[in-house]
Amino acid sequence: MEMLQGLLLWMLLSVGGVWASRGPLRPLCRPINATLAAEKEACPICITFTTSICAGYCPSMVRVMPAALPPIPQPVCTYRELRFASIRLPGCPPGVDPMVSFPVALSCHCGPCRLKTTDCGGPRDHPLACAPQASSSSKDPPSQPLTSTSTPTPGASNRSSHPLPIKTS
């Protein structure tokens, strides 16, 4: 009887684990809409805009005996295809380019995280929104539509796939 109970418990845990990993609580890697912030040091106004980024769950594994074997690379949700769009920052002084370009996700996939070009999580060195200013020049974030786009770039899986502010100097 004890062996039958152990077998039943093992089956329930096995099926429950498979069901939980495929449930609606973990949406798979896909393009989603996100609001980002853009600013330039010389321009007085920070704006927010909506674009599509790659986000979602990528299946991963962890070794049971990590000391015996090297770590398994963990996949991240990243761009498969993208295009670039641009926005114009209002109020920039003469001689300062008011255009800021950013990637727009067309399709996503689970792939390796390339630290050189991708935000792989962890602490951020800049905020995800417009910073409040103490001076009278406001950096309140008015919403801005996209102004121009370029052609899709297939196979560009090494672009940043998480919402980051676009800040240029």
Swiss-Prot record:
Keywords tagged on the record: Disulfide bond, Glycoprotein, Hormone, Secreted, Signal
Location of region: Disordered: 131-169
Any one biological process term the GO annotation gives: G protein-coupled receptor signaling pathway
Glycosylation sites (chain numbering): 33, 158
Single GO MF annotation: hormone activity
Gene3D superfamilies in the cross-refs: Cystine-knot cytokines (2.10.90.10)
Domain of life the protein comes from: Eukaryota
UniProt biased composition (Polar residues): 155-169
Cystine residue pairs: 29-77, 43-92, 46-130, 54-108, 58-110, 113-120
Signal peptide: 1-20
Gene Ontology CC: one annotated term: extracellular space
Location(s) in or outside the cell: Secreted
InterPro entries: Cystine-knot_cytokine, Glyco_hormone_CN, Gonadotropin_bsu, Gonadotropin_bsu_CS
Residue ranges with Low complexity bias: 145-154
Known function: Promotes spermatogenesis and ovulation by stimulating the testes and ovaries to synthesize steroids.
Record family assignment: Belongs to the glycoprotein hormones subunit beta family.
Subunit (UniProt): Heterodimer of a common alpha chain and a unique beta chain which confers biological specificity to thyrotropin, lutropin, follitropin and gonadotropin.
Protein name: Lutropin/choriogonadotropin subunit beta
Organism whose genome encodes this protein: Equus quagga burchellii (Burchell's zebra)
Gene that encodes the chain: LHB
